[in-house]
Every structure is written in structure tokens, then in C-alpha cells.
UniProtKB/Swiss-Prot annotation:
Gene3D superfamilies: Ribonuclease E inhibitor RraA/RraA-like. Its EC number is 4.1.3.17, 4.1.1.112. GO terms for biological process: regulation of RNA metabolic process. Substrate binds at G76, G77, N78, L79, R98. Belongs to the class II aldolase/RraA-like family. Catalyzes the aldol cleavage of 4-hydroxy-4-methyl-2-oxoglutarate (HMG) into 2 molecules of pyruvate. Also contains a secondary oxaloacetate (OAA) decarboxylase activity due to the common pyruvate enolate transition state formed following C-C bond cleavage in the retro-aldol and decarboxylation reactions. Keywords: Lyase, Metal-binding. InterPro entries: RraA (IPR010203), RraA/RraA-like (IPR005493), RraA/RraA-like_sf (IPR036704). Pfam families: RraA-like. This is Putative 4-hydroxy-4-methyl-2-oxoglutarate aldolase. The keyword Metal-binding applies.
Length: 160
């Protein structure tokens, strides 16, 4: 992993940085994380999240557009463990998580809208490696995502 540069410094130095609206909460045990984005677009079903977190993360960040659903959780403790075991830096979800006490203990950055006790559906549907837009930013596969105590932002893959 490269040296961490705080989001405040990046937003000052990189005017092209897309700064996300402060709508997501921090649920993971790691507050600061960064990496290349892997994107998913799903709707209240999380098998693609599971499948992705079971692959080598190689220091990347999984960005999940769950459509902003507040009806169920797209990530819980078991999937969070897969993320840690497979080297993911973090997960950003435009949707909900559950098992928040477990997630807080993991060495994984996790941002989501809220906590919800209901599990997601198990249909294998959705899209991977597509541009996703939420919180006022568009994230493309390979874009650099940086998150810390002050928020999160997106730099294009070509940015330093």
C-alpha cells in the first residue's frame, strides 16, 4: 500500500477529486483505507458481494451500489471476514450492513448508509465492473478511492 494522504489534503491538492456527500456511516474496524475500485450494481441480493470478497482483494476497495435500499443488509460479519482474509482494504456500500459489532472488530474499512437486521436475497443478479453513481460521485472500475475520518473521495484511475 502506498503512503496514506488524508482526504482533506487530497481534496485541496487535486481539484478534480470527486468528494462524496457525507451520507455514509463508518462501520468497519479500519477508518482509513484506500485502493483501486472494484464496482458492483445490485438490488437487495448479495451473492455478487460474497463472490467478489472471496477473490483476492490485492489492496482494492469494493464499491457496491445497492440502490440506496434500506430494506435489507448487503454485508454482514461473515462476508466481512472474507474481505479481511482475502486482502481487501475496504467496502463502500450504497445500502445497509448488519452484524455491526462484528464488523467493528474487523481490520477492514466499511462505509454504508445504515444498519439493518434483515439479510438480503440470494438471487445471483447484478453487474460487476460498471460505473456506479451515488453520494454525488461516479466511481469507475480502477478509480482510486480514499476514505478517512473526514469522508471519502474518488480520483480517476489516471490520477496519482
Amino acid at each position: 500500500m502506498t503512503d496514506f494522504i488524508p482526504t482533506t489534503d487530497l481534496s485541496d491538492a487535486q481539484p478534480q477529486a470527486q468528494v462524496a456527500a457525507p451520507v455514509l456511516r463508518d462501520f468497519g474496524g479500519r477508518t482509513r483505507f484506500q485502493g483501486a475500485a472494484v464496482t458492483l450494481r445490485i438490488s437487495e441480493n448479495n451473492p455478487l458481494v460474497r463472490q467478489t470478497l472471496q477473490t483476492p482483494g490485492a489492496g482494492r476497495v469494493l464499491v457496491v451500489d445497492g440502490g440506496g435500499s434500506l430494506n435489507c443488509a448487503l454485508l454482514g460479519g461473515n462476508l466481512g471476514v472474507f474481505g479481511v482474509e482475502n486482502g481487501w482494504e475496504g467496502v463502500i456500500i450504497h445500502g445497509c450492513v448488519r452484524d455491526t459489532a462484528e464488523l467493528r472488530e474487523l481490520d477492514l474499512g466499511i462505509r454504508a448508509l445504515a444498519a439493518h437486521p434483515r439479510r438480503s436475497g440470494k438471487l445471483e443478479e447484478g453487474e460487476r465492473d460498471v460505473p456506479v453513481t451515488f453520494a454525488g460521485v461516479t466511481i469507475r472500475p480502477g478509480d482510486h478511492v480514499v476514505a478517512d475520518e473526514d469522508g471519502w473521495l474518488v480520483l480517476g484511475a489516471e490520477s496519482p
